[in-house]
Amino acid sequence: MGLLNKIFGCKTITNTEDKGLPSFWEDDYCQIEIVPGKNKAHIETAIKQIEKFTEKTRTENGFTDIFIRESLPFPTLNEELRIDYFEKLLTEKGLQKAKQIRYDGYTITKCSPTTSNAISLPCFNLFYDCTYLFINNIWISTTLITSTDHFNIIVDTLYELGESSEMILINWNSSELIDLADKNQIKQYLMNYWK
């Protein structure tokens, strides 16, 4: 019996269908993103700028300012990566296409060609938004990976994006840049989430 039931005599209904939905918060948007490899030099420069900026603005209570990233010189949209190709590539690797996404913890939105979409495993979400028939942005969220099968699916999926589409992964939270055409780099990065 829940707290509301005890205090107010209310019956709360938990919708178990919503529990496994891919979920992201607004602050996570493109924080760990997959982008064209042509952006590598720009990203390496940005990482150095971020490191200098954090040294200047760090205090014992956090930071005194916010770093605003510039747009990438080679946006994912310019690669004309088709939605149908992208989704087929990922679902063939064993990920599931979501019909809905939980946004900011409570809002549930339907996936469509004009909204954010997700393809996921229980421990890994690959989000993307679209413009017409093409992928606009790709970003991920990863939780604790406890299955060897899931670990291998994620490695193979990210590697396929690196090999077939020459993509790289940038984690702006930790300033980690991963060449997705290098399985060793992918595995090393994912070990942060492995249990």
Predicted regions and their residues:
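Acidic (Asp/Glu-rich) sequence patches and key acidic residues
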Residues: 2-195
